[in-house]
UniProtKB/Swiss-Prot annotation:
Its cofactor is Ca(2+). CDD domains: PLA2c. Activated by trypsin cleavage in the duodenum. Can also be activated by thrombin or autocatalytically. This is Phospholipase A2. It comes from Homo sapiens. One of its GO terms (biological process) is defense response to Gram-positive bacterium. Coiled coil: none annotated. Residues 16-22 form a propeptide. The active site is at H70, D121. Belongs to the phospholipase A2 family.
């Protein structure tokens, strides 16, 4: 039941932030590709200053820096003419990628915006796989530790 509530909350949060729930699930699957035993939404949501919705201040560690870089990548995507959030973009249509072993490959058939977002997610997932996870940074008091 708790997982169902979490899934609903994440879907609402994703929709509110302009990212379709499908895009969030794709990013989750990418993380599971490179970290097979992980539970991305439970482990990485509300981690540090940047993992989850929003972000501010200085990242608390390498993993949090991965999330900050991912946020910045999405900000860059929004500046692309092909990502002007009309009808054909990865926020409303999913991108194509494959996972073989722990290798993620974004499809060459993706359009420019889809390819950009796919690579944002791919690079973040790989970054997550290389960064240590510090349980003390989960559900961090962002008002105390993440002010600019």
């Amino acid at each position: 039941m708790k997982l169902l509530v979490l899934a609903v909350l994440l879907t609402v949060a994703a929709a509110d932030s302009g990212i379709s729930p499908r895009a969030v699930w794709q990013f989750r699957k990418m993380i599971k590709c490179v970290i097979p035993g992980s539970d991305p939404f439970l482990e990485y949501n509300n981690y540090g200053c940047y993992c989850g919705l929003g972000g501010s201040g200085t990242p608390v560690d390498e993993l949090d820096k991965c999330c900050q870089t991912h946020d910045n990548c999405y900000d860059q995507a929004k500046k692309l003419d092909s990502c002007k959030f009309l009808l054909d973009n990865p926020y409303t249509h999913t991108y194509s990628y494959s996972c073989s072993g722990s290798a993620i490959t974004c499809s060459s058939k993706n359009k420019e915006c889809e390819a950009f977002i796919c690579n944002c997610d791919r690079n973040a997932a790989i970054c997550f796989s290389k960064a240590p996870y510090n349980k003390a940074h989960k559900n961090l008091d962002t008002k105390k530790y993440c002010q600019s």
